[in-house]
Amino acid sequence: MNFEKIEEAYTLLLENVQVIQNKLSTNFYDALIEQNGIYLDGQTDLEIVKKNHQTLKSLKLSREEWRRAYQFILMKGAQTEPLQANHQFTPDAIGFLLIFIIDQLMVASDITLLEMGSGTGNLAETILNNSQKEIDYLGLEIDDLLIDLSASIAEVMGSKAHFAQGDAVRPQVLKESDLIISDLPVGYYPDDQIASRYQVASQTEHTYAHHLLMEQALKYLKVDGYAIFLAPNHLLTSPQSDLLKSWLKDNASLVAMIAFFSM
């Protein structure tokens, strides 16, 4: 991996985003999506963007170099236009720990992986670029902005990732997967009617969205598959935890829990 090339790519991408942002009077993230579209189809009257794209293509970045450049771009955007907490990308330290766990757990060399709440796609690309496994990946994401970001970035990178838009809590037509992962969005799910279909549903308040996603995930998991969730440390002690533990006892085998301590 060439860090000088990553830095140059970051500089070129940032200039393009800023030029497009000023031209279209739009926000940072929509400008980034637009820049990705221009990179792919070459249709623009912005000469500086065309020139920068020629330079970008001459760098011949690897997929991991592209990922790092986009990661820095998203971090730059967050300085002026912060994403909500549930939309921020999973840190690399956790991503690489997940890769180690996946490579150790999964026996087969070819696996299918479903990510529920794929966000910006950074975790997906971290895994696809660095795992020893051959992975058939699908990411499911409800947010319009995030699905456009992740899909356009993946196409620029030449990634094998596929993304679909949908509410992961609602029923989806998906094939069963060997592995399911989710950096769980934490909070309440607003639709009590949908939530009432689940065993983890609360009868007294909105149900935790992360509990619903865990239950839903197992519906798409092969019998001998694994689900890996990044969850809050108070998962098993929160007010609705008894509902979750009751469901876990009847429907899943808990292999391990790893706690990350915050400073």
Identify the residue ranges that each predicted region occupies.
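Conserved Class I SAM-dependent methyltransferase catalytic core
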Residues: T207-S262
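Conserved class I S-adenosyl-L-methionine
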Residues: A108-G119
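Mobile active-site "lid"/loop adjacent to the S-adenosyl-L-methionine
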Residues: D183-L213, H234
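Conserved SAM-binding motif I beta-strand of class I
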Residues: D136-E141
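A short N-terminal interaction module
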Residues: M1-G77
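A short acidic, Gly/Pro-enriched loop at the edge of an enzyme's catalytic core
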Residues: R170-I181
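Conserved SAM-binding loop of SAM-dependent methyltransferases across substrates and taxa
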Residues: T120-K133
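Conserved SAM-binding loop
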Residues: S150-A151
